[in-house]
């Protein structure tokens, strides 16, 4: 396998601390990543060349967090330009969702981002459904880092953002129909929004854990905090 076939994906439930971890590791001199420019202009891969300035001492310290300086991004617009259902699927994405066209698109995207950024490894973050089967079909040697934040902290965080889909109830969110067990837990908590956010956390943590069995333990790391 060549270096383009071994990307690393940092994954979690959402509101789980993916960004702080990526802030710590993504600026390693060997790592390339999709930036806000790749997300805004998905087909202009040459914009990854801009990310090279992060390696300059001045931009890697004093100006690192200015808006115009390239930074890692949950680049859903980029991924969605390669597979229309990537951003907000109602279920997880699996091996059977990948056809040859999709596979070639994702491989090309990773290869070009690495090429223009001039790095030997690729890392990216995304949240929600695991998408492990999907990416494992495209990149058979890819690795995953699963960030599990305390469910109480995640539930509290979800209840403090306006865009959480749980505000509109379980029939408008993306995490499927609740099992009888989970529905009764929610019901017994007076249909609490906090309880529903905790249930969302449980659904997604279990989804990622279950699908992690697709890959070997050497390619899957879990970090809890």
Predicted regions and their residues:
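A conserved segment at the C-terminal end of the G1
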Residues: 19-30
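Walker A (P-loop) phosphate-binding loop of P-loop NTPases
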Residues: 15
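Extreme N-terminal, non-catalytic leader segments
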Residues: 1-7
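The Walker A (P-loop) glycine that initiates the GxxxxGKT/S ATP-binding motif of P-loop NTPases
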Residues: 11-12
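Conserved catalytic segments around the Walker B and adjacent sensor/switch elements
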Residues: 32-35, 221
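Phosphate/oxyanion-binding loops and surfaces in catalytic or ligand/nucleic-acid-binding neighborhoods
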Residues: 28, 34, 56-57, 161-165, ...
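PAPS-dependent sulfotransferase catalytic domain
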Residues: 87-91, 95, 111-225
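PAPS-dependent sulfation machinery
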Residues: 36-123, 171-185
């Amino acid at each position: 396998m060549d270096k383009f076939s071994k990307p690393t994906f940092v994954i979690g439930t959402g509101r789980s601390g993916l960004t702080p971890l990526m802030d710590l590791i993504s600026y390693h001199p060997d790592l390339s990543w999709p930036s806000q420019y790749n997300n805004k202009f998905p087909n202009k891969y040459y914009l990854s060349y801009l990310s090279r300035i992060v390696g300059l001492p001045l931009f890697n310290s004093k100006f690192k967090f200015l808006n115009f300086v390239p930074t890692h991004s949950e680049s859903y617009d980029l991924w969605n330009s390669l597979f229309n259902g990537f951003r907000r699927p109602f279920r997880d994405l699996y091996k059977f969702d990948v056809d040859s066209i999709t596979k070639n698109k994702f491989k090309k995207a990773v290869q070009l981002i690495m090429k223009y950024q001039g790095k030997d490894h690729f890392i990216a973050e995304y949240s929600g459904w695991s998408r492990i089967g999907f990416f494992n079909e495209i990149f058979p040697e890819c690795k995953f880092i699963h960030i599990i934040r305390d469910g109480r902290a995640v539930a509290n965080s979800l209840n403090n953002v306006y865009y959480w889909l749980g505000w509109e109830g379980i029939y408008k969110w993306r995490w499927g129909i609740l099992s009888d067990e989970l529905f009764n837990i929610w019901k017994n908590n007076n249909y609490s929004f906090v309880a529903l956010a905790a249930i969302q956390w449980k659904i997604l943590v279990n989804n990622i854990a279950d699908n992690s069995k697709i890959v070997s333990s050497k390619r899957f790391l879990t970090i809890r905090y």
